């Protein structure tokens, strides 16, 4: 564990009881908490939002906050402060969330509503150019001919931050499992910056703060390059990161070699967590100090996994990039 921070006591340690949901530390790390909505809360939430189809949430953005309020009210208004406290806490910053009884692809619309409610209790999800909505759903199959590693099943998708090739601030990332068939492997991979044993070395390197060019492939529907450094700091001077190996474009030999060594140092870290995410569950992480990726799948001709993502900004705190706006 890096000396910059240590895992601190949190709400889980205090034995506090919550209304409408439970909270426990995960098996993988005390930094990752598991939040489960009770069967009653789930049932009441879905009943109260049934009048709005997903299309209504797409067309009327204020409804995304309305469904969030409904969920928080069902949890005695304990949910929103807990989410914010956890995600903004450097010692944690990650949740694995599920709702009892929501675990089948036939409930895909209900999954989108639930994830939308949670996300809009902490901020607002950004427009996703790949899908043209505030969320994106995409499928991983046994054969893939796309232009990035997002849908390629038989290789590791390396650890990275989201939002590196767009100008919008990306404070959080939400990744939900909607469907899974004939699937072995493919766990989510997570790495907290303060558990990365090489952080000090790379954060203090002269290239860490040099603005670099990030460019996305055609499938992302983003044509404008953006420039920013790989590392920045938060309000307290602690390292945060905006990095993805696929889309950073080194301008010269020096940058290329450094980025290659950086990638190797991340991928070989002993601090990487392997987290199974069953259908209906979703990860919600602070994108500034958690990196995420995906392990490889075992090949199968009928392999299928459908995912939903949302990524956006925290509405209850200034963003954490301090030196490069």
UniProtKB/Swiss-Prot annotation:
Transmembrane segments: none annotated. It is an enzyme of class 1 (oxidoreductase). SUPFAM superfamilies: Clavaminate synthase-like (SSF51197). One of its GO terms (molecular function) is oxidoreductase activity, acting on paired donors, with incorporation or reduction of molecular oxygen, with 2-oxoglutarate as one donor, and the other dehydrogenated. Signal peptide: none annotated. Gene3D superfamilies: Clavaminate synthase-like. Its cofactor is Fe(2+). InterPro entries: GlaH (IPR015038), TauD-like_sf (IPR042098). Pathway: Amino-acid degradation. Its EC number is 1.14.11.64. GO terms for biological process: L-lysine catabolic process. Disulfide bonds: none annotated. Binds 1 Fe(2+) ion per subunit. Keywords: Dioxygenase, Iron, Metal-binding, Oxidoreductase. It catalyses: glutarate + 2-oxoglutarate + O2 = (S)-2-hydroxyglutarate + succinate + CO2. Fe cation binds at residues 160, 162, 292. Acts as an alpha-ketoglutarate-dependent dioxygenase catalyzing hydroxylation of glutarate (GA) to L-2-hydroxyglutarate (L2HG). Functions in a L-lysine degradation pathway that proceeds via cadaverine, glutarate and L-2-hydroxyglutarate. Belongs to the glutarate hydroxylase family. Homotetramer. NCBIfam families: PRK02963.1 (NF002814). This is Glutarate 2-hydroxylase. It comes from Escherichia coli O17:K52:H18 (strain UMN026 / ExPEC).
């Amino acid at each position: 564990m890096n000396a910059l921070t240590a895992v601190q006591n949190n709400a889980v340690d205090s034995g506090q009881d919550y209304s409408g949901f439970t909270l426990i530390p995960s098996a993988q790390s005390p930094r990752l908490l598991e939040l489960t909505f009770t069967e009653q809360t789930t049932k009441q939430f879905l009943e109260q939002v049934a009048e709005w189809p997903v299309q209504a949430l797409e067309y009327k953005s204020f409804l995304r906050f309305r469904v969030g309020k409904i969920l928080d009210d069902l949890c005695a208004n304990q949910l929103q402060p807990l989410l914010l406290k956890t995600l903004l806490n450097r010692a944690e910053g990650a949740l694995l969330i599920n709702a009892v009884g929501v675990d089948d692809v036939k409930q895909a619309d209900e999954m989108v509503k639930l994830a939308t409610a949670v996300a809009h209790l902490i901020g607002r999800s950004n427009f996703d150019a790949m899908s043209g909505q505030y969320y994106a759903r995409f499928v991983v199959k046994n054969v893939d001919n796309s232009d990035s590693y997002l849908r390629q099943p038989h290789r590791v998708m390396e650890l990275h931050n989201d939002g590196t090739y767009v100008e919008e601030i990306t404070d959080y990332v939400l990744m939900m499992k909607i469907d899974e068939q004939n699937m072995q492997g493919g766990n989510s991979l997570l790495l907290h910056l303060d558990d990365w044993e090489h952080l000090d070395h790379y954060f203090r390197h002269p290239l860490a703060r040099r603005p670099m060019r990030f460019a996305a492939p055609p499938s992302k529907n983003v044509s404008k390059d953006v420039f920013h450094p790989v590392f920045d700091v938060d309000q307290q001077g602690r390292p945060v990161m905006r990095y993805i190996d696929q889309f950073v474009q080194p301008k010269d030999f020096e940058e290329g070699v450094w980025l290659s060594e950086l990638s190797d140092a991340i991928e070989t870290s002993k601090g990487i967590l392997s987290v199974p995410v069953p259908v209906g569950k979703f990860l919600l992480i602070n994108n500034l100090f958690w990196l995420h990726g995906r392990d490889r799948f075992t090949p199968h001709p009928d392999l299928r996994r459908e995912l939903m993502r949302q990524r956006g900004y925290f509405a209850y705190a200034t963003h954490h990039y301090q030196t490069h706006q």
